[in-house]
């Protein structure tokens, strides 16, 4: 068993997944542990902007981890989103802000899960609880994660804690959250030069909801109309994913952070779940739903209820 403890977020990592791993690794190392941040996929343009802005290296891409390797996971607690051989590893901790899912251990672990808008909000709180000041780099990355996950407090997942922690971290990082958010979102929402596969997998998660296997990708944009040229190829890619990976439905949320709503594109034999969950009617595999900003709070719960017949 290696001496190192790897800390990683979920597959198809978003900004919170990457930044939380880096920030929590710094905290654990300051507490005397030997940790290394990792990742389970490519980095998005938004995350790349944050890393470059705060002069941080991308975490190590984790592949083929040996049995009993010590690991801490952040920003998820769902097996389908985690390391492929998680059951062979030695899971030490989980830090997360999502629903309690299906990861199990045969021994007790430290598991901190809170109903806040971002995992970095929890990790930032842990710094302050322990009286440890994060570096400017770690503070900036946690700010980036909170801004990203809460859409700068536009998302309904936002809590008072998110606002409080961001305010403290922004002082350490020496940034104006509004100005920085505008720059980060602008960098992150550009689709120019991307393939449909890159767009879809920039923030994609698989869920087992009741007896259904559902895939949900979310792409933040400032221009939904600009996606039209990608739609045909995107539907072909999503249909292939449904067939190859036995999904009941695959969804893409194109979330407009200015208009505060999402265009939902859906494929698969159970796309009727979208109609039922949101009281809408898909037309040509798509429907715009005002007010939908959060996959976690506004998409997964109604889909679950639709599946369960509630």
Swiss-Prot record:
Gene Ontology molecular function: inorganic diphosphate phosphatase activity; manganese ion binding
SMART domains documented for this protein: DHHA2
Annotated binding of Mn(2+) 2, by residue: 16, 75, 97, 149
Metal-binding in keyword set: yes
Pfam family, one: DHH
Keywords, comma-separated and alphabetical: Cytoplasm, Hydrolase, Manganese, Metal-binding
Statement: the UniProt record of this protein carries the keyword Amino-acid biosynthesis: no
InterPro entries (alphabetical): DDH_dom, DHH_sf, DHHA2, DHHA2_dom_sf, Mn-dep_inorganic_PyrPase
Top EC group: hydrolase
EC numbers, comma separated: 3.6.1.1
GO cellular component: cytoplasm
Superkingdom to which the source organism belongs: Bacteria
Cofactor: Mn(2+)
Subcellular location: Cytoplasm
Free-text cofactor note: Binds 2 manganese ions per subunit.
UniProt catalytic activity: diphosphate + H2O = 2 phosphate + H(+)
Residues annotated for Mn(2+) 1 binding in this entry: 10, 14, 75
PANTHER family assigned to the protein according to its UniProt record, in alphabetical order: BNIP - RELATED (PTHR12112), MANGANESE-DEPENDENT INORGANIC PYROPHOSPHATASE-RELATED (PTHR12112:SF22)
Protein family membership: Belongs to the PPase class C family.
Name of the featured protein: Probable manganese-dependent inorganic pyrophosphatase
Organism: Clostridium acetobutylicum (strain ATCC 824 / DSM 792 / JCM 1419 / IAM 19013 / LMG 5710 / NBRC 13948 / NRRL B-527 / VKM B-1787 / 2291 / W)
Species lineage: Bacteria, Bacillati, Bacillota, Clostridia, Eubacteriales
Gene: ppaC
